[in-house]
């Protein structure tokens, strides 16, 4: 996503916002995403195909900016707050509980410098997003972290659920 605001042209900056959505909007969003009928797809790999990890994903918008999900409209409150100039991809990741806080491989989301990545956390648990510089962002319900899409990062799976 390319941001319209002044944050878009700041290099190597990261923005963390707690309580990103108002409580009612947050609850409405999570109810849909966490319901048993929400369609998740198995992916053999997290950072790369067949990297030894797996996750479930839901693609709302593909790499070309095409809407691919009938659930896209549930993202309107998030998109309204983010106010992107353009959307390149929107994907939800669902990871499963592991025995330890397993780290996936470090990766970048794009080589393009102007594109920002936004990670929105639907629940609180002991998983996180870890950056190459050692910075760790804990998974906290209704938190969002916005950073340069070419900044190396990885997911750290949850091992205990604290909801």
Outline where the language-model segments fall.
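Conserved small/polar residues in nucleotide/adenosyl-binding loops
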Residues: 161-163
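Conserved metal-binding segment of the jelly-roll/cupin
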Residues: 137-153
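Conserved short histidine dyad/triad with adjacent acidic residue
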Residues: 94-111
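A short glycine-rich, His/Asp/Glu-containing loop-to-beta-strand
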Residues: 80, 84-99
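Non-heme Fe(II)/2-oxoglutarate
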Residues: 2-86
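A short beta-strand-loop-beta hairpin characteristic of the jelly-roll/cupin
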Residues: 101-103, 113, 121-140, 156
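Short beta-strand His + acidic residue motifs that chelate non-heme Fe in jelly-roll/DSBH
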Residues: 105-107, 152-159
């Amino acid at each position: 996503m390319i941001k319209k605001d002044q944050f878009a042209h700041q290099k190597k900056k990261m923005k963390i916002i707690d309580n990103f959505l108002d409580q009612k909007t947050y609850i409405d969003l999570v109810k849909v995403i966490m319901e048993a009928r929400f369609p998740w797809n198995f992916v053999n790999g997290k950072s790369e195909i067949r990297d030894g990890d797996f996750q479930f994903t839901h693609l709302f918008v593909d790499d070309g900016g095409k809407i691919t999900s009938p659930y896209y409209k549930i993202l309107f409150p998030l998109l309204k707050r983010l106010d992107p100039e353009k959307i390149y991809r929107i994907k939800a990741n669902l990871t499963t509980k592991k025995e330890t806080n397993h780290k996936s491989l470090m990766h970048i989301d794009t080589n393009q410098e102007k594109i920002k990545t936004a990670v929105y956390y639907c629940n609180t648990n002991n998983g996180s997003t870890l950056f190459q510089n050692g910075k760790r962002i804990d998974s906290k319900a209704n938190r969002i972290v916005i950073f340069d899409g070419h900044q190396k990062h990885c997911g750290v799976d949850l091992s205990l659920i604290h909801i």
